[in-house]
């Protein structure tokens, strides 16, 4: 049986066993396509059911989360934790609180996390979790009660050497605080390393808040350097206006580029003169208002509800909002308008068709599992500080993050070249991330 037939047969089986999980199917299909190249060259990676084991979570947890609102009404949400692979270290990955969360989305995120964490070079496995709870419109006490109920079940499955969750969409510093506080009460110990994204006074790390956005920019900076260019003077589109987007905007402008647009779920803002990051942070983090407020208050900025942010002309695009936000038509428009570099700050924000268009049109593309690995890398640095009872300076932590992102780019670039797909960073990231995990799995036996 040829490698194509082996992979095709396995993927057909995976579709049947994981029906109704399109995001998970999409993530696996992309990786399997890259792995065909590895299996042709190194067939021993097909031994001992390795591919099947890699695509099957070690453990899937689904649990009810009952909580009481401010009016005394009981609500029941569903909680998830997918502990996907621990060959390299304890499961590591965020918690997402959003109405869209279901098992398929958590599995897709956990599967991507395996390769992302592997690429960091740090000893962490892959996992992901969350709930279909919506924090929007909830009071402080309602969010606290929900977090405490969620942790009442989750606490028995996590630990600094077992599984280390962090934040994600809907789970910020406030939620991490409530989750950690309840874990501490249930466990009767101050186990700092059990969660990352903590407050600075109780075990958190500097740069953690900025890490994903900064890291995405450090990655695209390496992509540009490899072409003999710099960020200076380049025009950049950044979708989103949350944590990742805000700090990507800050860092890319510090390095000399101009951000010409950003967005939220209500619309997008064109900013031909660049973005006032302090004003954006005040609007989104303090007032929690829509991006239309930015256009109302900053001269030269315009708010749009029609068209797409991807209609803007730019050299670089950084999708930092949510999965599948950038489709094939958007990709064609970007390429037509002269965009030459794309790096994903969000998880899987580009559709498979969009990625194909970028490849066909010669647009260099940095996949999320590599480009946005700065967040989990700095989470692992937080774990290191917790383990040594130490606290590092902002400058030192940022320098470590920058070095990790440079190494991730080099690993992707070198691996892509080794397997005959130079500058295809999707292939490079998938294969480089896979080989490290696969070697560990083969060494540890069939478990």
Swiss-Prot record:
<comment type="subunit">
    <text>Homohexamer.</text>
</comment>
<dbReference type="InterPro" id="IPR033524">
    <property type="entry name" value="Glu/Leu/Phe/Val_DH_AS"/>
</dbReference>
<feature type="binding site">
    <location>
        <position position="116"/>
    </location>
    <ligand>
        <name>substrate</name>
    </ligand>
</feature>
<dbReference type="GO" id="GO:0004354">
    <property type="term" value="F:glutamate dehydrogenase (NADP+) activity"/>
</dbReference>
<feature type="binding site">
    <location>
        <position position="92"/>
    </location>
    <ligand>
        <name>substrate</name>
    </ligand>
</feature>
<feature type="binding site">
    <location>
        <position position="212"/>
    </location>
    <ligand>
        <name>NADP(+)</name>
    </ligand>
</feature>
<feature type="binding site">
    <location>
        <position position="167"/>
    </location>
    <ligand>
        <name>substrate</name>
    </ligand>
</feature>
<dbReference type="InterPro" id="IPR006096">
    <property type="entry name" value="Glu/Leu/Phe/Val/Trp_DH_C"/>
</dbReference>
<protein>
    <recommendedName>
        <fullName>NADP-specific glutamate dehydrogenase</fullName>
        <ecNumber>1.4.1.4</ecNumber>
    </recommendedName>
</protein>
<dbReference type="InterPro" id="IPR014362">
    <property type="entry name" value="Glu_DH"/>
</dbReference>
<dbReference type="InterPro" id="IPR036291">
    <property type="entry name" value="NAD(P)-bd_dom_sf"/>
</dbReference>
<feature type="binding site">
    <location>
        <position position="243"/>
    </location>
    <ligand>
        <name>NADP(+)</name>
    </ligand>
</feature>
<feature type="binding site">
    <location>
        <position position="379"/>
    </location>
    <ligand>
        <name>substrate</name>
    </ligand>
</feature>
<dbReference type="InterPro" id="IPR046346">
    <property type="entry name" value="Aminoacid_DH-like_N_sf"/>
</dbReference>
<comment type="function">
    <text>Catalyzes the reversible oxidative deamination of glutamate to alpha-ketoglutarate and ammonia.</text>
</comment>
<dbReference type="InterPro" id="IPR006097">
    <property type="entry name" value="Glu/Leu/Phe/Val/Trp_DH_dimer"/>
</dbReference>
<dbReference type="InterPro" id="IPR050724">
    <property type="entry name" value="Glu_Leu_Phe_Val_DH"/>
</dbReference>
<feature type="active site" description="Proton donor">
    <location>
        <position position="128"/>
    </location>
</feature>
<dbReference type="Pfam" id="PF00208">
    <property type="entry name" value="ELFV_dehydrog"/>
</dbReference>
<keyword id="KW-0521">NADP</keyword>
<dbReference type="GO" id="GO:0005829">
    <property type="term" value="C:cytosol"/>
</dbReference>
<keyword id="KW-0560">Oxidoreductase</keyword>
<dbReference type="InterPro" id="IPR033922">
    <property type="entry name" value="NAD_bind_Glu_DH"/>
</dbReference>
<dbReference type="Pfam" id="PF02812">
    <property type="entry name" value="ELFV_dehydrog_N"/>
</dbReference>
<dbReference type="InterPro" id="IPR006095">
    <property type="entry name" value="Glu/Leu/Phe/Val/Trp_DH"/>
</dbReference>
<feature type="site" description="Important for catalysis">
    <location>
        <position position="168"/>
    </location>
</feature>
<dbReference type="GO" id="GO:0006537">
    <property type="term" value="P:glutamate biosynthetic process"/>
</dbReference>
<comment type="similarity">
    <text>Belongs to the Glu/Leu/Phe/Val dehydrogenases family.</text>
</comment>
<feature type="binding site">
    <location>
        <position position="113"/>
    </location>
    <ligand>
        <name>substrate</name>
    </ligand>
</feature>
<dbReference type="GO" id="GO:0005737">
    <property type="term" value="C:cytoplasm"/>
</dbReference>
């Amino acid at each position: 049986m040829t490698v194509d037939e082996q992979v095709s047969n396995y993927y057909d089986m995976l579709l049947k066993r994981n029906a109704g999980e399109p995001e998970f199917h999409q993530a696996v299909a992309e990786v399997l396509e890259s792995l065909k190249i590895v299996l042709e060259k190194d067939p021993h990676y097909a031994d001992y059911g390795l591919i099947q084991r890699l695509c099957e979570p070690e453990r899937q947890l689904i649990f009810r989360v009952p909580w009481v609102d401010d009016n005394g009404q009981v609500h029941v949400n569903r909680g998830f934790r997918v502990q996907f692979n621990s060959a390299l270290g304890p499961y590591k990955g965020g918690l997402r609180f959003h109405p869209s969360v279901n098992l398929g989305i958590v599995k897709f995120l956990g599967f991507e996390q395996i390769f992302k964490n592997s690429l960091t070079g740090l000893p962490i496995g892959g996992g992901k979790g969350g709930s279909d709870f919506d924090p929007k419109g909830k009071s402080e006490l309602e969010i606290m009660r929900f977090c405490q109920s969620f942790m009442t079940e989750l606490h028995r499955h996590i630990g600094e050497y077992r599984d280390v969750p962090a934040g994600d969409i809907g789970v910020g510093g406030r939620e991490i605080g409530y989750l950690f506080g309840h874990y501490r009460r249930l466990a009767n110990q101050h186990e700092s390393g059990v969660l990352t994204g903590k407050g600075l006074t109780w075990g958190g790390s500097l740069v953690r808040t900025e890490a994903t956005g900064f890291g995405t920019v450090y990655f695209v900076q390496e992509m540009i350097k490899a072409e003999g260019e710099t960020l200076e003077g380049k025009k950049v589109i950044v979708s989103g206006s949350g944590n990742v987007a805000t700090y990507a905007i800050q860092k890319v402008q510090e390095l000399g580029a101009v951000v010409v647009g950003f967005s939220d779920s209500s619309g997008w803002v064109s900013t031909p003169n660049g973005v006032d990051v302090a004003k954006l942070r005040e609007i989104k983090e303090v007032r929690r208002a829509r991006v239309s407020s930015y256009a109302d208050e900053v001269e030269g900025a315009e708010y749009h509800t029609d068209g797409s942010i991807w209609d803007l002309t730019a050299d670089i695009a950084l999708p930092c909002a949510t999965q599948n936000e950038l489709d094939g038509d958007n990709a064609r428009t970007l390429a037509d308008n002269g965009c030459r570099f794309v790096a994903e700050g969000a998880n899987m924000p580009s559709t498979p068709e969009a990625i194909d268009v970028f490849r066909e049109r010669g647009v260099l593309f940095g996949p999320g599992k590599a480009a946005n690995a700065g967040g989990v890398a700095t989470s692992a640095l937080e774990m290191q500080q917790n383990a040594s009872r130490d606290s590092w300076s902002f400058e030192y932590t940022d320098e470590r993050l920058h070095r990790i992102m440079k190494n991730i780019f080099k690993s992707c670039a070198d691996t892509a070249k080794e397997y005959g797909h130079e500058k295809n960073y999707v292939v490079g990231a998938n294969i480089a991330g896979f080989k490290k995990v696969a070697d560990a799995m083969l060494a540890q036996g069939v478990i």
